[in-house]
Structures are given as C-alpha cells and as structure tokens.
C-alpha cells in the first residue's frame, strides 16, 4: 500500500489545467488591443470569472499595427487599476452596469497606466485606452460594444477575431468525460 502516498504526491505535483483565451479589441482611430488570459479549468462553466481568478493576463496596445505598449499581470502593484469580469459561458467580457466594468491598468479617468505604459478601460463613458499615462480620447468606442475571447490566435488588426457578433463561434466545448 506504499503506492498511495506516491500517487498522491504525483497528482499534487501535476500542474492544474487552465483555460487560455485570446481576445482582440478594435477601438476608434486605428487603435486596437490584443490580449491573453488564463484561469483555472474548474471555472470554465462558472457564472463569472473575476480578476481574483485570473492566473495570467497580458495586453498589448496598437495603433495602425504599430506597437504602443504592453501590460501584464506580473506588473500588478498596489496602486494598479485592476478590475476584470468575464462570462466563460458566453465567452465575453460583460459591458453593463454603472461605473467602470473593466479596468486593466487604466482606472475610470483612463490616465493611470504609467509612462511608459498601456491600459484599457470600459465603463459608462465608453471603451478606450491609456497610453503613457494619457487618456486617448480618440480611441473611444461605445460602452456596449461586445468584447469576446476565444482560443484562436489574434492579430493587431483583429482579423478573424470574434468581436462584434451576437454569438461566439469559437467557444470550445468541454472535453467529453
């Protein structure tokens, strides 16, 4: 029966499975953002995934295909604006409510992403980006614009990204049990 402790040790050492998704946001005036996030597989069918559940996250800002900046969860500090909600069933970031819905290194004033820096914000005023500590007003699109995530790689042009559709074509069904 010495096999059981070895089996438990091996299972404990095995990495937990994670859901990895990519997303692409297309703002106004040639601005876009690509991103990647991971969260535990056990939350694949949860009602909501929040910033507290995310195990890896990174975003890169672009304008007309030129890189503007980058932010990742590894740079999270006590003063970083960090608010995220994601619906893993619909594979979309909810953009409803009052106030700020998403704050990825950019709070409500969209000017706290650092210099150099990049951040994204979505709230009642719209969806927009922060570049080098500056609110880029010309990037703003309507707050209710859907933002989806999927398993397909994305490009700064958001080509093929499931962004503005009523259904999400890239939802990966759970593996058969």
Task: Give the ranges of each region predicted by the language model.
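Absolute protein N-terminus
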Residues: 1, 18-19
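Sec-dependent signal peptide recognition
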Residues: 1-9
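N-terminal signal peptide c-region/cleavage motif recognized by signal peptidases
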Residues: 13-15
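An extracellular/secretory-lumen and virion-surface interaction module
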Residues: 19-177
């Amino acid at each position: 029966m010495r096999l059981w402790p070895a089996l438990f040790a091996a299972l404990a050492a095995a990495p937990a499975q994670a859901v990895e998704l990519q997303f692409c946001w297309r703002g106004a005036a040639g601005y876009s953002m690509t991103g990647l996030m991971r969260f535990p597989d056990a939350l694949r069918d949860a009602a909501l995934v929040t910033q507290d559940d995310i195990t890896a996250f990174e975003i890169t800002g672009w304008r007309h295909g030129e890189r503007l900046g980058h932010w990742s969860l590894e740079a999270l500090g006590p003063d970083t604006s960090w608010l995220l909600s994601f619906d893993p069933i619909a594979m979309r970031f909810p953009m409803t409510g009052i106030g700020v819905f998403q704050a990825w290194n950019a709070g409500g004033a969209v000017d706290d992403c650092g210099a150099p820096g990049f951040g994204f914000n979505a709230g009642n005023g719209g969806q927009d980006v922060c570049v080098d500590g500056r609110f880029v007003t010309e990037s703003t699109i309507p707050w209710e614009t859907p933002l989806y995530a999927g398993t397909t790689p994305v490009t700064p042009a958001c080509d093929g990204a499931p962004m503005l559709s009523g259904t999400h074509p890239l939802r990966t069904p759970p593996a058969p049990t």
